[in-house]
Amino acid sequence: MSLPYRQIHLDFHTSECIEGIGSRFSRENFKAALQAGHVNSITLFSKCHHGWSYHPTKVNLPHPHLCCDLLDEQLAVCEELGVRTEIYISAGLSEQYAVRHPEHLRRDKNGYGGNFDTEAGYHRLCFGTAYLDQVAAEIEEMLTRYKGRFDGLFLDIIGMVPCWCPDCVQGMKERGLDPESDADAWKYARVIYDRYTDRVAEVVERVIPGLPIIHNDGGAIFQGRDIAFCNQGHFELESLPTGGWGYDHFPRAAAYARTLGRDFLGMTGKFHTTWGEFGGFKHPNALRYEAALANACGARCSVGDQLHPDGEFDLATYNLIGAAYAEVEAREPWLTGSALTADIGLLSAENFRRICPNALPDGNLNPDLGANRIMLEGHYLYDILDPEADFGKYRLLILPDTMEIPEGELRDKLNAYLAGGGKLLIGACHLRNSKQCRWLCGHV
C-alpha cells in the first residue's frame, strides 16, 4: 500500500484519574469525523504515555476505567471505510510502570531519575534495563492480537540519550568505557539504541514480516542515515510550528529527508499551540498553509489531534482539518508519482558534524537555519545533503561557513565533484584559511 497523503495522528494520553474512557465512542461518530476530515490514514493507540493499554492485555495493564476494546472498535470503522491505520505504542514512557519499577528509570550522571512526589510529568525509562523485555512483550501481543488489521507500527519517545542507571554504568564498564566520560556515555547510548531497534525488528519480523516501523524522536532526522534507516518504511517528521519546533524546522528537515529515497510525511497539529490542547483550534488558513507546504516540500501530510477521554470525536476539529485536506485531495493526481527536483545542494553543518567536529560551534544551528531561509525565500530548487549524498546530481554545492573540510574522503569527494564541472559556493572560513585555500586553488 502506498503511503496516503491525508493522515491523522490521534493522541490518547489519558490519566488513570479520568473515568468513562471510551464511554461515548460510537462508530457512526468516528465515521463522520473521518469523512468530514477527508482522512485516508490514521494512527490509533494501543498504549499511551501513562502506560495504559486501550484493549484487553495480558502483558500490560488496561486503563482502569476503559469501557470497551477501543482499539478494536476504531479499527473496525477504518476497515469499513478503507482507511489505512498505524498502531501507536509509547515505548520510552510508561508512567504506571515507572512508578512500579523505578529501578528501570533513565538516570542522569548523578544517578537522579526524577521525584514522583514533587515533580509532575512523565519519567523516561531506560532500554538498557529489563524494561526492554516489557516493551517487546507489549509489541508482540498487539501485533498478534490485531494481525492483518493494520498497516504500520508507531513507537514514540525513542530519542538516543545517555543514561547512568546501574545497568548502563555496568554495561559501560564491561566494554571498557568510562562512565565519567560524557563521550563514552554517548557511545554506550548508541549500543542501547541499537539493542532496542534490533529487538523490535526481530519481534516484528517474526510476527508480521515487512511491517513498517516508525521510531519517533520528535522529527530529529539529522542523526545520520544509519539512525534514519532504523525506521522500516517511510519517515514521519513531527514538526508542530506553534508547538516548539517553529516554522524553520519542517522545510529544513524535509529538504534532507527527500534525499534518502523514501516516502515521508510532515506531522503538524490542529492545535493552536501544541499537543493535548483540547480547546485550541488552529486557524483553517494556517492548517491549509502547513498542508500545502508539506506537499511543496515533497511530503505527505499528518495532522495531530487528541481524542477526548470519553471517545467522542469533535466534528469541529474534523471540519477544520477537512478544509486543508480537501485541497490536498484535489492536488493528489499531480502529487502522486512526482518527485521534487533540485540543482543546488546545501551541505548542512549539522549533518557533517560527525566528520567535521568544528562544523557546529557551540551547537549553534543558526548557520543552517539562515542558509535554509535564503533558499526558501529565494525560491531556489535545493536539497540538504549529508556526506553520503551523490554530489554529482547538483550544479552547485554550498558549504557551511563554519566548517573546515578535513583531509580524507569528503575532500576527495569534493575534488571529484569540482573536476567534473561542479561549482562550490564558499565563504570566509575557507578563504581566510590558507590550508583550506590550498586544496581549492587547483580548481580556480
Model-derived regions: residue spans:
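Active-site-adjacent "subsite" loops/lids of carbohydrate-active enzymes
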Residues: 87-147, 186, 199, 386
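Aromatic- and acidic-residue-enriched segments that line the glycan-binding/catalytic groove
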Residues: 54-66, 91-120, 155-180
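Carbohydrate-binding surfaces of carbohydrate-active enzymes
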Residues: 2-4, 33, 64-74, 85-87, ...
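Aromatic-lined substrate-binding rim segments of carbohydrate-active enzymes
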Residues: 48-94, 404
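N-terminal structural segment of carbohydrate-active enzymes
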Residues: 1-51, 81-83
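Short, solvent-exposed turn/loop segments enriched in Gly/Ser/Thr/Pro and often Arg
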Residues: 11-13, 43-50, 89-96, 154-164, ...
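Short acidic/polar active-site loop segments enriched in Thr and Asp
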Residues: 6, 39-41, 148-151, 300-301, ...
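Active-site mouth loops of central-metabolism enzymes
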Residues: 12-26, 119-134, 274-284
